[in-house]
């Protein structure tokens, strides 16, 4: 079993390996590091798990490496994947649903490589069910026959329906709704609960309108262990981009790894960079729980196994038309 403390703290050696490709360029004179390479278009959607990417942008890590990175904001992870499929995007930031990415892999085998995931669980929270502050709903089982909203796309809806089923909440109806509307829909009484991702739960809690029913739900109900790492989101680059720009790709991943390192070692400094990229602002950023992060060179066999178990849910349910092996999708330097 993967220990969350282990997957939260990378060894210095692994971080140095991930960052090694960027050392030479970061030491080069500014004139050498001028942004002359290709534009790197990275899709994201407004969830807290994208923090290493937001931090790397705002701290100037990409610019320091001489990279021209363009963040592309989408309403959901499905659109991020579609942009990669159509050639309008070169990769994804953390938080982009790994099941959404897998659908792209099925449509176009060899589409992308994952260089960083954001494992979450009951300790490192990203996923949760929330309800109105004064609601009578106390447990997941209380959602029996209720109206539940989930984030958009096949990953969110499949997980939401499966978790409700496994928690004994039979007869619940699930509706897709952008996560930015989850708190408002609960306040307006349009739904009884939402399966959502941070920072939504924090926003509702801090403005006194919603509360969490249960957090870290995917690890518990899908993977069978509240402390299991759910590799539900990932930073990736398209294989086409990597092949055309191998050195630029290494520099990009090295600069991105600096964002991961900042989140790991200085979370309070990093949190502020959610502002402008997610729906959370100002002092509220200090309240958001953070997911963990795992770089491509930090995966252990147990991590691959839990990641595979997550993917197998979608093939077992017929959402994926075939089994998608995880290991070949992980970037190799």
Model region roles, listed by residue range:
Residues 1-11, 21-25:
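N-terminal secretory signal peptides
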Residues 30-34:
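Sec/Tat signal peptide C-region and signal peptidase I cleavage site
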Residues 35-167, 173-177, 185, 192-198, ...:
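Short, glycine-/small- and polar/acidic-enriched structural segments
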Residues 64, 122, 217-228, 294-304:
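Short, solvent-exposed loop/beta-turn-alpha elements that line the ligand-binding surface or hinge
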Residues 71-73, 79, 208-211, 233, ...:
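N-terminal secretory/targeting leader peptides
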Residues 97, 181-273:
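Pocket-lining segment of extracytoplasmic ligand-binding domains
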Residues 242-319:
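Secondary-structure end/capping motifs
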Residues 311-333:
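Conserved C-terminal helix/tail region of periplasmic/extracytoplasmic solute-binding proteins
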């Amino acid at each position: 079993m993967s220990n969350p403390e282990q997957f939260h703290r990378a060894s210095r050696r692994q971080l140095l390996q991930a960052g090694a490709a960027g050392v030479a360029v970061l030491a080069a004179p500014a004139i050498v590091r001028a942004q002359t390479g290709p534009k790197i278009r990275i899709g994201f959607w407004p969830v807290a798990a994208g923090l290493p990417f937001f931090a790397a942008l705002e701290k100037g890590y990409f610019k320091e490496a001489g990279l021209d990175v363009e963040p592309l904001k989408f309403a959901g992870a499905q659109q991020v994947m579609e942009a990669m499929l159509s050639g309008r995007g070169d990769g994804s930031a953390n938080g982009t649903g790994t099941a959404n990415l897998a659908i792209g892999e099925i449509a176009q085998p060899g589409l992308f490589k994952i260089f960083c995931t954001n494992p979450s669980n009951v300790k490192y929270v990203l996923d949760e069910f929330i309800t109105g502050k004064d609601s009578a709903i106390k447990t997941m089982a209380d959602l029996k026959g209720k109206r539940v909203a989930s984030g958009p796309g096949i990953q969110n809806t499949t997980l939401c329906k499966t978790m409700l089923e496994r928690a004994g909440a039979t007869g619940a109806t699930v509706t897709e709704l952008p996560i930015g509307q989850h708190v408002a829909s609960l306040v307006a009484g349009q739904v009884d609960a939402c399966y959502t991702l941070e920072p939504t739960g924090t926003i509702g809690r801090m403005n006194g309108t919603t509360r969490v029913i249960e957090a870290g739900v995917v690890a518990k109900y899908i993977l069978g262990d509240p402390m299991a790492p759910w590799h539900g989101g990932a930073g990736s680059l398209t294989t086409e981009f990597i092949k055309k720009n191998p050195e630029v790709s290494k520099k990009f991943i090295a600069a991105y790894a600096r964002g991961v390192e900042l989140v790991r070692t200085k979370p309070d400094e990093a949190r502020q960079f959610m502002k402008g990229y997610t729906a959370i602002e100002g002092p509220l950023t200090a309240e958001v729980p953070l997911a963990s992060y795992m770089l491509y060179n930090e995966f252990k066999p147990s991590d691959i196994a839990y990641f595979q178990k997550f993917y197998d849910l979608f093939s077992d349910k017929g959402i994926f038309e075939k089994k998608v092996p995880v290991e070949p999708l992980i970037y190799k330097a």
